[in-house]
């Protein structure tokens, strides 16, 4: 069966082969006229990334890219991304890639309008309320692997470059406005990454199914995926 469908849970998701062709429309829906595509170094020069940039450019949205992203993104990557965002006078982010690109893209969109340091927004208590919610830029997310689920998450994992500890940066508006899930973007992955991200997705579903916080829709989705 070939699935091509739209749904919201609660993020608006466009799923189907070839739907990366809708990237410009997704930006328009999100209110983005001058996006910064954030991805990792490995993906930056790949055909799928260049195709996406071409689609944006053809629609008059430019082809700006930031790819100074480590496998475990840190606050230095975030600061550099925010600097690129401001220098280019962008008004939104296309977070593109696996967990690294998605997490950092979300953080760049979040921090671009903030004045406090990133660690002031760690997922502790109500620290997320410190943020200027109206200053958070819109996000369109495009996952290129099956595993992380960051495209539908309200947080990003950022590594402290000094302590080497991973921290969760949280805000409800980390949720992208639109997600494009195009299976064709995953075809070129190495076998071990395909296997690893598939198991990652499976593990997320096991966790959701076994959670003591019962949610019938989450249980149904978890069972279907497993």
Which ranges hold each PLM region?
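ATP/NTP phosphate-donor binding region
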Residues: 1-92
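Electropositive phosphate-/nucleotide-binding environments in soluble metabolic enzymes
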Residues: 13-21, 46, 50, 75, ...
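Glycine-rich nucleotide phosphate-binding loop and flanking beta-alpha elements
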Residues: 21, 100, 146-148, 187, ...
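Predominant activation on well-ordered alpha-helical scaffold segments within soluble catalytic domains
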Residues: 24, 53, 64, 79-82, ...
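Anionic group-transfer/hydrolysis microenvironments
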Residues: 41-42, 145, 184
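Glycine/threonine-rich beta-strand-loop-alpha-helix active-site module
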Residues: 76-181
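Carboxylate- and glycine-rich phosphate/diphosphate-binding segment that chelates Mg2+/Mn2+
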Residues: 155-226
């Amino acid at each position: 069966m070939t699935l091509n469908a739209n749904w919201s849970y609660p993020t608006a998701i466009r799923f189907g082969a070839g739907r990366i062709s809708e990237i410009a429309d997704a930006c328009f829906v999100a209110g983005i006229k001058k996006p910064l595509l954030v991805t990792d170094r490995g993906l930056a020069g790949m055909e799928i990334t260049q195709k996406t940039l071409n689609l944006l450019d053809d629609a008059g949205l430019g082809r700006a890219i930031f790819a100074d992203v480590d496998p475990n993104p840190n606050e230095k990557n975030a600061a550099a991304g925010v600097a690129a965002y401001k220098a280019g006078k962008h008004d939104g982010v296309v977070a593109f890639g696996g967990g690294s690109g998605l997490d950092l893209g979300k953080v760049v969109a979040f921090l671009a309008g903030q004045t406090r340091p990133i660690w002031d927004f760690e997922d502790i208590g109500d620290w997320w309320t410190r943020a200027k919610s109206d200053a958070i830029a819109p996000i369109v997310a495009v996952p290129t692997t099956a595993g992380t689920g960051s495209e539908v998450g309200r947080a990003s994992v950022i590594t402290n470059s000094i302590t080497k500890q991973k921290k969760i940066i949280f805000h409800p508006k980390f949720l992208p406005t639109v997600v494009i899930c195009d299976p064709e973007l995953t075809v070129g992955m190495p076998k071990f990454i395909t296997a690893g991200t598939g198991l990652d997705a499976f593990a997320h579903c096991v966790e959701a199914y076994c959670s003591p916080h019962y949610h019938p829709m989450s249980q149904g989705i978890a069972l279907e995926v497993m």
